[in-house]
Amino acid sequence: MSNVDRAEIAKFEALAHRWWDRESEFKPLHEINPLRVNWIDERVSLAGKKVLDVGCGGGILSEAMALRGATVTGIDMGEAPLAVAQLHQLESGVQVEYRQITAEALAEEMPEQFDVVTCLEMLEHVPDPSSVIRACYRMVKPGGQVFFSTINRNPKAYLLAIVGAEYILKMLPRGTHDFKKFIRPSELGAWSRDAGLQVKDIIGLTYNPLTKHYKLNSDVDVNYMIQTLREE
């Protein structure tokens, strides 16, 4: 059984043509991208690394990591977002290899091939997040690192990520997120450890609606990212 939610894919297929419009529904992704790439780069030094971006969508993170000197492969199951990613790299001149394939299928094909694997804002959109985490473990080289980001599951996250972002501030289309699919840090940590990954660090991402700025800090109540290591 494929670990793909067709309804989730359809949501992003419908919006794909606006992926690189910085004033569109993807504005938050564009704004948080530099913060996240810096955090990752500080921990792994992307230059010269072979990197896999799981759930790459239209390529915002993939291109940013390639610009830091990484050799990047981006995978996604959305045909339209991948088409947008491929068109955008023709425009930007940034080289990324894009493929329409699941993490699980690529893990069969390319075990232990990547220095770094990123899987950001993707786990909350698949039926079985732990399956993706296991696939990421299989694809990263021993001694390599895997980064995940998702949204915590608690009343504050519901109020800010769904009610606030989708209904009040209208930063995202209604229905972008399903609260039941949000993932607590304890759950993500347990799935990572079960897969063989050691959790090294965790950071929160917060948004100030008054200043309209994001920042990384210790508050993991809503958005957060973890760094994990596959030991040698």
Swiss-Prot record:
A single MF term (Gene Ontology): polyprenyldihydroxybenzoate methyltransferase activity
Record pathway: Cofactor biosynthesis; ubiquinone biosynthesis
Coiled-coil segments: none
Domain of life: Bacteria
CDD domains hit by this protein: AdoMet_MTases
EC id: 2.1.1.222, 2.1.1.64
Enzyme class, UniProt record, top EC level: transferase
Binding site for S-adenosyl-L-methionine: R36, G55, D76, L120
Gene Ontology BP annotations: methylation
Family matches, as SUPFAM superfamilies: S-adenosyl-L-methionine-dependent methyltransferases
Family that this chain belongs to: Belongs to the methyltransferase superfamily. UbiG/COQ3 family.
Alphabetized NCBIfam families for the sequence: UbiG (TIGR01983)
Role according to the record: O-methyltransferase that catalyzes the 2 O-methylation steps in the ubiquinone biosynthetic pathway.
Protein name, UniProt field: Ubiquinone biosynthesis O-methyltransferase
Organism: Pseudomonas putida (strain ATCC 47054 / DSM 6125 / CFBP 8728 / NCIMB 11950 / KT2440)
